[in-house]
Every structure is written in structure tokens, then in C-alpha cells.
Regions:
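N-terminal periplasmic/intermembrane-space "pro-region" immediately following the signal or transit peptide
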Residues: 2-3, 15-17, 21-82, 88, ...
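Transmembrane beta-strand segments of Gram-negative outer membrane beta-barrel proteins
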Residues: 46-53, 67-90, 122-124, 132, ...
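Short loop/turn motifs that connect adjacent beta-strands in outer-membrane beta-barrel proteins
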Residues: 61-77, 110-122, 166-169, 230, ...
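Transmembrane beta-barrel strands of outer-membrane/channel proteins
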Residues: 77-85, 122-128, 172-176, 233-239, ...
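Residues on the lipid-exposed face of transmembrane beta-strands in outer-membrane beta-barrel proteins
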Residues: 79, 105-111, 158-163, 221-225, ...
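Outer membrane beta-barrel
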Residues: 96-242, 365-372, 381-405
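Outer membrane beta-barrel transmembrane domains
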Residues: 266-269, 294-327, 342, 361-369, ...
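Outer-membrane beta-barrel "beta-signal"
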Residues: 463-477
Length: 477
């Protein structure tokens, strides 16, 4: 980048300000973990903070000495922006494009440096969400096109304190937390833009208000323990509804404990990765991977997707209209991230694959099965060590009772009625690292059987398959 002419530098810098962004999930303080999971993204990290605008890690550098001064007292401040323009070229609800944006600010305090308490971390973060959601207005798909889509607002995101014990083998986090920062995470899947490669479709549609995941969070306690150098266990107890008693809780400050309880547990196995405290023996031909299994349980009451409280179909004109209630809901899941090829153990080029699958009861849930899988190539071209190119598929299956209800409506109305079955989205993406602080991402998504076979605006009509293209830009300030 040093060979660029000044005019080009000025132009590129102006573009950066116009299209600024940074992947919000990647900046979570949870990425400093005591857990053994490796960063399979293998991003190159310089040993020093260079001062040149094109080579430093943050656009604003040390902000005139402010960052290092705060760092002496254990305070880390981050500001990031994600901006994107996505357009639907065919099918769905209508053609056209929309702009979406997300600003994330976070403050982390290391209590050892701040006031001498070892092993403590305090975190507070906030979101400013702006723009218009393509999926809601143009697509009508279940696999929503962008992981930053949400209602426009400025809100508190996370507010928690974490304390480690036993030489960092155990840590406890308490406070307002977003589960998608630690649970059900696939690092390779995070390369992609579609929402379902982040927080999956199944909890998004089956838990109250989508569960405590971006842009929401919930009060709770999470415990993490390193059982062996390669095996880590996580368990958490959280409020069951992140919006609580106030569905218009746009500020994120309605701290609620009155809407059921969500329990979640996960085991993580790290393959071919040095654990904390172990000596790094240098480059190895062994290929790293991470494997996870987990379960969540919610003790609230969940409406049957087909039957009312008298045993009739909800589509029956004689139905009471009150769905039969089920006590509790649950899901099992598995996640795998595995590097499968790396020609040079000292180089950046590598090929990784991922898979994630979840299942839940079909009687009380709109989505009974959700899965995604894909492949990611790091450093695809010579001299592009921090670029990534990926191809992935995400799949949603409608629960048996929701599907049966559609069939009942078709029978009782004696006319056309879309029966929802499943929906699949194929995504291809390329991340181009312009500078350490600026990334451009070109993206294309094609959705098969959009809306799972039903138009959400008119259930008697189907949706045509959608084709979405767009550009996302990420900036770390």
C-alpha cells in the first residue's frame, strides 16, 4: 500500500469514511478467552502498532496518545461501523436495494491494571442501528440476508463483569449478555453475510423474540471451565425473554427476570491447538479444528403450531383460536470447524470447512431443523494473505405442525394456500482486506423456495426464488 500515489490515498480514505464498518461480532471482548478455541481465521497480527494510516490496526491510530494512556489503566475503547448495500435482483416481495448500517462502541476494563484485582474484566457495549432491512421489505425469506438487520435504534447491548479463578481454568460472567458471542458459534461461518451463519435460524424463530442474541441481550450467569487442555465446558442461565415485559424496549435497559428461564450448555473440543499455558512449539503440519455439542432448554410455555386447546385445528372455523400450550422447549446442536488443507504451516493460505446442525420439536416450533455448511479459503491469491473467499449453504425446515396447519387452511378454504416446507440459501462471498482497519466484502445470495413456499404478505401466493447481491464495508476506528 505504500506505493500508492497521494491522490489515490485521498480518494480511498474518503471512500472509507463514506462506507465505514467493522464486523461487530469479531470485536467482542470474549475473544480474549481463557478457552482453548483457536482463531481459525488465522488473521495476521503485527507485533507493533505502526503509525502509518495505511498500516496501523485502527483508522484513528492511538488518537493522539489517548489509547496507550487508557491502556495503562486497563481501559480499552473500540468503535466500529458496518455499512452495506444489498439489492434483490429477482423474486421475493419486490426488486430493489436498501442500505443498512451498524455502529458498535465498546469499553473493556482489565481490573488488574485498573485497581489491582487480578482476573477481572468489565465490559459495556452499545449499538446504533440504522438503515432499512432488505429481507423485511424486499425478500420475505426465512434465511434473512444480513446479520446486521434489526430495528433502527440506539441501544445498550452487553453489560457484564467476568472473573477468572484457579489460574484461569474457570471463569464466571454475570450481567447482560448476548449468547451469540459465545454459544453455537462457528468461526468459519462468521465469514458470511446471511444472518443464519451467525445466530442460527432455529433459535431465531423458536425462542421468545429470537432469544438473547444480536441486537438483544439478557440478564444471566455464564460459567466456563477448562476440563482438560483441549476440552472446555460452558453453561449459562439467562432470562427467557430478552424484551421482557416491554416489547418496545428499544433502549436495551429493561433488565428483566420475569419471563421464564433459558438454560444452555456446550462442550468444546479443540483439536491440534496449544492450550493456555502450554509452550507453542512453532509451526506444525497438524491442522487445527474445533468441535462443539450443546443443548438449550426454556421452561416457558409455547403454543402448538397446529392444534387449539380443544384439540381442533387452528384452521377449523369452529376452533377456539387459542393454541394448545406446551410446557418447555428445547434443542440439541452440533458445530464443527476444521482446517483441511494448508500447504505451508508458516503461511497464511489454508482451506477450512464448517458444519452446524440443530433440531427441536416440530409441534411447538416454527422451525424444527436448521443447518448450514460451507468452505472458506484464506489467502486465495499471492500477496492477499488477509483475504478470504467462501461458499456456503444454509437450510431451514418448517416444523411438522406448522406445515400441517398450512395444509388444514388449504383444506378448509378450498382454495390455493401456500404450504411451507423448507428454504435453502446459497451464498458466495469475498472479503478484501484493503488495510488492517478497512475491509470490503462482495456478496451474492440465491434463495430456493423463498418463504419456504409461502408469501408472508399473501399466504395464498408463493414467492419466486430471490437473488441478492451487495457490498459490505467494515472499518475499525
Amino acid at each position: 500500500m505504500r506505493d500508492r500515489r497521494p491522490a489515490f490515498r485521498r480518494t480511498a480514505l474518503a471512500c472509507a469514511w463514506l462506507f465505514s464498518s467493522a464486523a461487530f461480532a469479531a470485536a467482542s471482548p470474549d475473544a480474549q478467552p481463557e478457552a482453548p478455541e483457536a482463531d481459525l481465521a488465522i488473521h495476521a497480527q503485527p507485533a507493533t502498532q505502526w503509525t502509518g494510516v495505511w498500516t496501523r490496526q485502527n483508522l484513528l491510530g492511538d488518537i493522539g496518545g489517548l489509547r496507550p494512556w487508557l491502556g495503562k489503566y486497563g481501559v480499552t475503547f473500540s468503535l466500529q461501523e458496518t455499512s452495506e448495500y444489498l439489492a434483490n435482483l429477482r423474486g421475493g416481495l419486490k426488486r430493489g436495494g436498501t442500505y443498512d448500517g451498524l455502529t458498535t462502541a465498546a469499553v473493556t476494563v482489565d481490573t488488574q491494571k485498573a485497581f489491582g484485582l487480578p482476573g477481572g474484566t468489565f465490559n459495556a457495549s452499545a449499538l446504533q442501528i440504522h438503515g432499512r432491512n432488505l429481507s423485511q421489505y424486499n425478500l420475505g425469506t426465512l434465511n434473512t440476508a444480513s446479520g446486521i438487520e434489526a430495528q433502527d435504534t440506539t441501544r445498550l447491548w452487553e453489560l457484564w463483569y467476568q472473573q477468572s479463578f484457579l489460574d484461569q481454568r474457570v471463569d464466571v460472567k454475570i450481567g447482560q449478555q448476548s449468547l451469540d458471542q459465545e454459544f453455537i458459534v462457528s468461526q468459519y461461518a462468521a465469514t458470511f453475510v446471511n444472518t443464519m451463519f451467525g445466530w442460527p435460524a432455529l433459535p431465531s424463530y423458536d425462542l421468545p423474540n429470537g432469544g438473547p442474541a444480536y441486537p438483544l441481550s439478557a440478564l444471566g450467569v455464564r460459567v466456563r471451565g477448562r476440563i482438560t487442555p483441549s476440552l472446555t465446558a460452558l453453561a449459562g442461565v439467562f432470562d427467557g425473554d430478552p424484551l421482557g415485559n416491554n416489547p418496545n424496549n428499544l433502549s436495551g435497559t429493561n433488565f428483566n427476570l420475569h419471563n421464564g428461564t433459558l438454560f444452555i450448555g456446550e462442550l468444546q473440543y479443540a483439536l491440534n491447538q496449544p492450550a493456555d499455558g502450554q509452550m507453542d512449539m512453532g509451526p506444525s503440519n497438524a491442522l487445527p479444528g474445533t468441535y462443539k455439542i450443546g443443548v438449550w432448554y426454556h421452561n416457558g410455555r409455547f403454543a402448538d403450531q397446529q392444534t387449539d386447546n380443544t384439540g381442533l385445528s387452528l384452521a377449523n372455523p369452529a376452533s377456539s383460536g387459542v393454541a394448545r400450550a406446551h410446557h418447555g422447549d428445547y434443542s440439541f446442536y452440533a458445530v464443527a470447524d476444521q482446517m483441511v488443507w494448508r500447504p505451508d504451516p508458516t503461511g497464511a493460505k489454508s482451506l477450512g470447512v464448517f458444519a452446524r446442525v440443530m433440531a427441536a420439536p416440530g409441534d411447538r416450533n416454527l422451525v424444527s431443523v436448521a443447518a448450514n455448511a460451507g468452505v472458506v479459503l484464506k489467502a486465495p491469491f499471492e500477496g492477499r494473505d488477509n483475504d478470504s473467499v467462501g461458499l456456503a449453504l444454509t437450510y431451514v425446515k418448517i416444523g411438522s405442525h406448522a406445515r400441517a396447519l398450512d395444509e388444514d387452511f388449504a383444506s378448509f378454504t378450498d382454495g390455493p394456500y401456500g404450504v411451507r416446507t423448507s428454504e435453502t440459501t446459497l451464498e458466495a462471498t469475498y472479503q478484501y482486506q484493503v488495510t488492517p482497519w478497512w475491509q470490503l466484502q462482495a456478496d451474492a445470495q440465491y434463495t430456493f423456495n423463498a418463504g419456504a413456499g409461502q408469501n408472508p404478505s399473501d399466504p395464498t401466493q408463493p414467492l419466486r426464488n430471490t437473488f441478492v447481491v451487495g457490498l459490505r464495508t467494515n472499518i475499525t476506528f
